[in-house]
């Protein structure tokens, strides 16, 4: 449990880079569409290369698993990654990095409250500690948030709240369907791959709606892919594996 908690805290640290870089890309004129899509466009080849270098038959194992239940993988990968990161990027466009980071912590409570969907009772002790953490975060940010208009808060908070629910939901549903031999790295790669139809459609829409991304946004997206798409996601999913 202590290792899982430490991994979760470390994942939050890496996620913080995402909020800062997303806000920076927005202030630089970049669209949330490309902030979202480029992260996964870059994350996929990075994870592919890691699995290839690692050997141990990981790529073949995850491809066989996806072929065994393709619709399950497509659906829950879209929920866990598509409906997580697209709304998160949209919310980051309307809110400061501190507001996005604080609101994102709702995912701690959301993960606990989703427990009955997987045939288990809500662990009240974990829920209690999660609520303490969440309340503490919002108390620290309340005075600054009070200075914002309701419209600004709603535009930032609603997409982030959706993301905070979809992220643990998609992850834990696929944990149910994956056999034990599928590692965390393999599952993250599989979800990234199977969410690609969503990102390709969103990217095609983005070309027509906002044009192509700038070179600066592309470069910053590589950083997001490394910090959030690889490091934070692997740590978060590994921590979830440890406590399931």
Predicted regions and their residues:
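Glycine-/small-residue-enriched transmembrane alpha-helix faces in small-molecule transporters
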Residues: 1-38, 78, 90, 135, ...
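Transmembrane alpha-helices of multi-pass small-molecule transport proteins
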Residues: 28-83, 110-114, 132, 165-170, ...
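Hydrophobic transmembrane alpha-helices of multi-pass small-molecule transport proteins
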Residues: 47, 125-144
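Hydrophobic alpha-helical transmembrane segments in multi-pass integral membrane proteins
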Residues: 83-89, 137-149, 195-210
